[in-house]
Design a protein with these regions (language model features):
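Conserved catalytic core of the tyrosine transesterase superfamily
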Residues: 2-3, 7-231
Length: 231
């Protein structure tokens, strides 16, 4: 069919490849949901808030007299809880006799293990203000939902609330999320002390490697800590 020239041989090979290409089934298309999940995975971890950003959000909530949001923000920073655990806190988890305690213990949804966290004076004050202003008939949860068929604020609603805090402070919303709240105090503790084991305990990680990844610790961080030690 083809002559014996070099051009004829190349044409023959190309023709075989084209036949094979048409006979070969096309790879299945990636569903849109998988694409979105892949995008989310490539975005990376959300950054912790810096102290000046914490104060910017806090002052804004105080000026606007947003008692619920101020209490939620302060407690999110102090407790270092995952969003699902934060929104499902009950009043009796954090208060006794109408007064907010300085420490609380709950059972985590994800792991089923108990966890203790501190409630600092500033957070206690904002929580006390919110509990005093919160309607008593709204159920047992610290942050009851405004939607009648939901007992408390959902994790999805919490994510939208956090987005509003970030946006209201004039920050880039793509860089922050609910995990920013969980990471903020832990990151500051690590930067000030270098005590990775303490941060691991506070975040309730079973493996130290998880804490390293969660904090995003890099070689530069290790070198910075090393430079602070003289022998």
């Amino acid at each position: 069919m083809f002559n014996g020239t070099r051009e004829g041989a190349l044409f023959a090979l190309a023709s075989v490849d084209m036949v094979d290409l048409h006979a070969r089934p096309l790879p299945p298309q990636r569903p849109h949901s998988a694409g979105r999940a892949l995008y989310r995975n490539n975005v990376g971890q959300k950054r912790p808030l810096r102290p000046k950003e914490v104060w910017a959000i806090r002052v804004r909530l105080q000026i606007k007299n947003r008692k619920r949001d101020l209490a939620m923000f302060n407690l999110a920073i102090d407790s270092k809880l995952r969003g699902c655990d934060l929104v499902s806190l009950r009043v009796d988890d954090i208060a006794s006799g109408g007064h907010v305690r300085d420490r609380a213990t709950i059972v985590q949804h994800n792991t089923g293990r108990p966890v203790q966290f501190e409630i600092t004076e500033q957070t206690r004050a904002s929580l006390q203000d919110w509990l005093n202003a919160r309607p008593a008939d709204r159920g047992p949860y610290v942050f009851p939902s405004r939607v009648h068929d939901q007992p408390h604020v959902t994790a999805r609603q919490y994510a939208r609330i956090v987005h509003g805090w970030i946006e209201g402070a004039g920050m880039d919303t793509s860089g922050y999320g609910t995990h920013s709240m969980r990471r903020t105090k832990a990151a500051q503790i690590y930067r000030k002390t270098g005590n990775l084991r303490a941060v691991q305990l506070l975040l309730r990680h079973t493996k130290i490697e998880s804490t390293v990844r969660y904090l995003g610790i890099e070689v530069d961080d290790a070198l910075r800590l090393s430079e602070q030690v003289e022998l």
